[in-house]
Swiss-Prot record:
Motif 'KMSKS' region per record, residues: 227-231
CDD domains: S4 (cd00165), TyrRS_core (cd00805)
E.C. numbers: 6.1.1.1
GO cellular component, one term: cytosol
Taxon lineage: Bacteria, Pseudomonadati, Pseudomonadota, Gammaproteobacteria, Alteromonadales
InterPro entries: aa-tRNA-synth_I_CS (IPR001412), aa-tRNA-synth_Ic (IPR002305), Rossmann-like_a/b/a_fold (IPR014729), S4_RNA-bd (IPR002942), S4_RNA-bd_sf (IPR036986), Tyr-tRNA-ligase (IPR002307), Tyr-tRNA-ligase_bac-type (IPR024088), Tyr-tRNA-ligase_bac_2 (IPR024108)
Function: Catalyzes the attachment of tyrosine to tRNA(Tyr) in a two-step reaction: tyrosine is first activated by ATP to form Tyr-AMP and then transferred to the acceptor end of tRNA(Tyr).
Positions contributing to ATP binding: K230
Any one GO biological process: tyrosyl-tRNA aminoacylation
Name this protein carries in UniProt: Tyrosine--tRNA ligase
Organism the protein comes from: Idiomarina loihiensis (strain ATCC BAA-735 / DSM 15497 / L2-TR)
Keyword presence, Cytoplasm: yes
Length: 401
């Protein structure tokens, strides 16, 4: 393998969970032909978050090696609703919602990608031209048994949970997108494996060379458990104010911090290993987390904004003398929420709800450094954060439904 190709593969596959097949990728890169690299995004909400950027960063790497990136906005597929990882049928979006959200995607993606090397496409370009007969012919290429090999469909079927017929079309449509684009490479998360391989199958049937599939790991959300998702409200949006982004990044656990370095930072592996060694030798993990926060904010805002966000964080949090060893608690608040007094009691910050109410009345309760005064407030998942009662009682409370 030529040195140039080996170097390209090392950069392209860095952090990837799986590559199918690496030898195919090497042959395509060795050809010297600019490759068509595809990644699809369904506009299910109007803002990109850091979880999306794991893929987009990888697309940028391909661009830096001279290849063409197709950022495919699944406006047609978005009206189906991706069933991946869901145990219920996802409600499809309206045409108006899809169009509005897609426009926002277009505005945001160039914060990372080079506009001159990016082709923005919508899969409605070809899918909306398909008639009933064409769609039936496409559906006939696969069997129900094959579709039930997909984990989420299999689980729902075994649990007697409904699966709508249109959900079976989603992998086929995503696969057909690869045929229409003549994709050489497709990127996707590990949860998209079934759909990505469908593209290879359909391309073979159409006489095309099957796309190489590169699967990137899923980025965990702020809770450190479930994947970052707008619908789970555990995400950091790339257009959020710099101060908000800084605070959210600083709130992640030390363990999750290293995961974010691996998948979001452009620092070399050597640099990250040096930071790990420094922490092992006694360096405060919070100082390292600041480096991560500033790098990400500089990317999506500016270096000046990153500096200002750090100063704002210092004023709001560090001057309030937050301890380094804040215990982490998980409190289940239910779909309708839980009263703030009960949350404080469940987290062990007070002995009773009456004490909680008394402390709130005395302005002795803070959430993320801000005084809390509403004793009737119902806490929901979005209210996770650092809770303080008095001067010495702290807890990082993760609220779950």
């Amino acid at each position: 393998m030529k040195t140039e190709v080996a170097e390209a593969i090392a950069e392209i596959t860095r952090g990837a969970e799986e590559v199918l097949l690496e030898q195919e990728l090497a042959e395509k890169l060795a050809s010297g032909k600019p490759l068509t690299v595809k990644a699809g995004f369904d506009p299910t909400a109007p803002d990109l978050h850091l979880g999306h950027t794991v893929l987009i960063n990888k697309l940028r790497v391909f661009q830096d090696f001279g290849h063409k990136v197709v950022f495919l906005i699944g406006d047609f597929t978005g009206m189906i609703g991706d069933p991946t990882g869901k145990n219920v049928t996802r409600k499809p979006l309206t045409t108006e919602q899809v169009i509005a959200n897609a426009e926002t995607y277009k505005e945001q993606v160039f914060k990372i990608l080079d506009p001159a090397k990016t082709e923005i496409r919508f899969n409605s370009e070809w899918m909306s031209k398909m008639g009933a007969a064409d769609m039936i012919k496409l559906a006939a290429r696969q069997t129900v048994a094959r579709m039930l090999e997909r984990d989420d469909f299999k689980k729902r079927y075994q649990n007697n949970q409904s699966i709508a017929i249109h959900e079976f079309l989603y992998p086929l449509v995503q696969g057909w997108d690869s045929v229409e684009l003549k994709a050489d490479v497709e990127l996707g998360g590990t949860d998209q494996r079934f759909n990505l391989l469908m593209g290879r199958e359909l391309q073979k049937e159409e006489g095309q060379r099957p796309q190489t599939v590169i699967m990137t790991p899923l980025l965990e959300g702020l809770d450190g458990v479930q994947k970052m998702s707008k619908s789970l409200n555990n995400y950091i949006g790339i257009t959020e104010p710099a101060n908000d982004m800084f605070g959210k990044i600083m709130s992640v656990s030390d363990e999750l911090m290293w995961r974010y370095f691996q998948l979001l930072s452009f620092r070399s592996i050597t640099e990250i290993d040096e930071l790990k060694a420094a922490v092992a030798d006694g360096k405060n993990p919070r100082d390292v987390k600041v480096l991560l926060a500033k790098e990400i904010i500089a990317r999506f805002h500016s270096e000046d904004d990153a500096e200002k966000a750090e100063q704002d964080f210092i004023q709001r949090f560090q001057k309030n003398a937050l301890p380094d060893d804040i215990p982490e608690k998980t409190v289940q608040v239910g779909a309708e929420g839980m009263a703030i007094g009960n949350v404080l009691k469940e987290a062990g910050l007070v002995e009773s709800t009456s004490e909680a109410l008394r402390m709130i009345k005395q302005n002795a309760v803070k959430v993320d450094g801000e005084k809390f005064s509403d004793s009737r407030y119902l806490c929901t998942e979005k209210d996770s954060g650092v809770y303080q009662v008095g001067k010495r009682r702290f807890a990082k409370i993760n609220l779950t439904a």
